[in-house]
């Protein structure tokens, strides 16, 4: 099984395309020069398109993904603000872009060729939205707003319009700073990493996906850590057994075990990683984690122990300057 790994390096305006084999080895396939500082990336649900957000000319570049994982540019569309995080709906019809600095979220249609078009809606006055996350039902968009310590909830219509959800916004602990989210594969639990206190909140999803209730909040840092907390990313293994977060001050990956129903997580350890791990991801087999070092200009591959979730370092690889994002496309026909 061979997968494709995409690493976005904004300071050199590049995407490095790698092939990941079943042993965890990476082979460089392509280096793509991007028209701007590339940061957030998202892969279409059918795994045939890669979308990347760029600045300072704010926009989304659409790429077609070949069978071997290499990229061909297919189009570019404008955005109303600097893209911080992007996601697509689960049918590949719409792309959502959260702009932290411009306090907005925009919705862009995706045409039948998989190319993102100009936005059709813009939601303003959102205090520092750090991500836009479509829920497992494809009906609700969750937007963590870091500066107001809330996760905003919006209903998504069939036409790609967002309206406030019936449930009140989720309020997190004061000063926590909600940032990125992940969903358990059972679709019944959501996780949110909080940037400013490096904690993880666990939410039970009920009423056919319509309600979110906090069931646990857990510190992700070592007990003796006294530095500034600065969490970044969060991902869960495809089997739902292990959850990971990154902290950029400590240069750590936090390792959690997850209960069978997803509602209880337990911190079991930490693994030192690349300098300032802004982004990481887990491959589709659940065997490997790949982390990027924004200050090291390298990525590092780890093997995930299937019995404990602990990480074993395999190899590090040079990439572009200031790598911030890692996306992984599954093996074709797998």
Swiss-Prot record:
It catalyses: 6-phospho-D-glucono-1,5-lactone + H2O = 6-phospho-D-gluconate + H(+). InterPro entries: 6-phosphogluconolactonase_YbhE (IPR022528), Cycloisomerase_2 (IPR050282), Lactonase_7-beta_prop (IPR019405), N2O_reductase_N (IPR011045), WD40/YVTN_repeat-like_dom_sf (IPR015943). Belongs to the cycloisomerase 2 family. This is 6-phosphogluconolactonase. GO terms for biological process: glucose metabolic process; pentose-phosphate shunt, oxidative branch. It comes from the Bacteria. Keywords: Carbohydrate metabolism, Glucose metabolism, Hydrolase. PANTHER family: 6-PHOSPHOGLUCONOLACTONASE (PTHR30344:SF1), 6-PHOSPHOGLUCONOLACTONASE-RELATED (PTHR30344). Pfam families: Lactonase. The keyword Hydrolase applies. Catalyzes the hydrolysis of 6-phosphogluconolactone to 6-phosphogluconate. The gene is pgl. GO terms for cellular component: cytosol. The keyword Hydrolase applies. Pathway: Carbohydrate degradation; pentose phosphate pathway; D-ribulose 5-phosphate from D-glucose 6-phosphate (oxidative stage): step 2/3.
């Amino acid at each position: 099984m061979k997968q494709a790994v995409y690493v976005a390096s904004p300071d050199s305006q590049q995407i490095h395309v790698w092939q990941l084999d079943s042993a965890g080895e990476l082979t460089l396939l392509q280096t793509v020069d991007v028209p701007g500082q590339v940061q957030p990336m998202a892969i279409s649900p059918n795994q045939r398109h890669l979308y990347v957000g760029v600045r300072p000319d704010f926009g989304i570049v659409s790429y077609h993904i070949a069978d071997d994982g290499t990229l061909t540019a297919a189009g570019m569309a404008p955005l109303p603000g600097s893209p911080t995080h992007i996601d697509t709906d689960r049918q590949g019809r719409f792309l959502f872009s959260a702009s932290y600095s411009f306090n907005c979220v925009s919705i862009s249609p995706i045409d039948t060729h998989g190319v993102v078009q100009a936005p059709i809606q813009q939601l303003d006055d959102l205090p520092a939205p750090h991500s836009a996350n479509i829920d497992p039902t494809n009906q609700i968009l969750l937007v963590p707003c870091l500066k107001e310590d809330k996760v905003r909830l919006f209903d998504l219509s069939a036409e790609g319009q967002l309206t406030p959800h019936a449930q009140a916004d989720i309020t997190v602990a004061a000063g926590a700073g909600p940032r990125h989210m992940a969903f358990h594969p059972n679709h019944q639990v959501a996780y949110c990493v909080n940037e400013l206190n490096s904690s993880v909140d666990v939410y039970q999803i009920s009423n056919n996906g319509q309600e979110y209730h906090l069931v646990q909040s857990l510190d992700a840092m070592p007990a003796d850590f006294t530095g500034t907390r600065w969490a970044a990313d969060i991902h869960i293994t495809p089997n739902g057994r292990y959850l990971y977060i990154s902290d950029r001050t400590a240069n750590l990956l936090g390792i959690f075990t997850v209960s069978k129903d997803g509602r209880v997580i337990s911190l079991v350890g930490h693994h030192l990683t690349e300098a300032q791990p802004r982004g990481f991801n887990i491959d589709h087999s659940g065997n490997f984690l790949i982390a990027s070092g924004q200050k090291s200009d390298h990525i590092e591959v780890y093997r995930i122990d299937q019995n404990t979730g602990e990480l074993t370092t395999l190899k590090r690889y040079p990439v572009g300057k200031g790598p911030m994002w890692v996306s992984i496309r599954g093996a074709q026909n797998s």
